[in-house]
């Protein structure tokens, strides 16, 4: 497995390249390996699996300190546009966002550190996204930003 920095601008966000194997039995996708998970996230407290329909936009979600969380995301069915927004006020990239298409046919995963809001739009008829989170859900620290309030091209025709 290889990991690489998403871009020079967002040098804390990483793209992971794992294994995606197809044969007559179906598909095997390994997006990240154990030691790398611990290096990136420190711990894994939650595993989320979310299935959504075409044109759905989920997000932009985050948790404030001291319950901020990092995430590792991959798509196991369909195709999504995954978006991350820097909400760290003292960051050079504060208020800027990046995006990456993730789909079931690739071997990619995306690591998003604490201090970023996260969301995605569904580009295929349906999509299933799986992600690991470094902390537990904390309603008192939970926050969201309306994804349509920002100038982000979600690549969907009729957002749901």
Features from the language model and the residues they span:
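Conserved metal-binding segment of the jelly-roll/cupin
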Residues: 102-125
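Non-catalytic, conserved peripheral segments adjacent to functional cores
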Residues: 1-105, 126, 133-160
């Amino acid at each position: 497995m290889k990991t690489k920095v998403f871009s020079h601008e967002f040098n804390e966000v990483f793209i992971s390249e794992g294994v995606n194997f197809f044969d007559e039995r179906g598909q095997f996708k390994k997006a990240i390996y154990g030691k790398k998970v611990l290096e990136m996230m420190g711990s894994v407290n939650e595993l989320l699996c979310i299935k959504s329909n075409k044109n759905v936009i989920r997000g932009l979600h985050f948790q404030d300190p001291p319950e901020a969380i990092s995430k590792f995301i991959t798509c196991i069915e369909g195709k999504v546009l995954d978006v991350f927004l820097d909400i760290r006020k003292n960051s050079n990239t504060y208020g800027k966002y990046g995006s990456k298409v993730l789909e079931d046919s690739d071997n990619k995963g995306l690591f998003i550190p604490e201090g970023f809001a996260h969301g995605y739009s569904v580009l295929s008829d349906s999509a299933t996204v799986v992600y690991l989170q470094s902390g537990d859900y904390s309603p008192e620290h939970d926050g969201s930003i309306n994804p349509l309030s920002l100038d982000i091209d979600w690549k969907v025709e009729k957002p749901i």
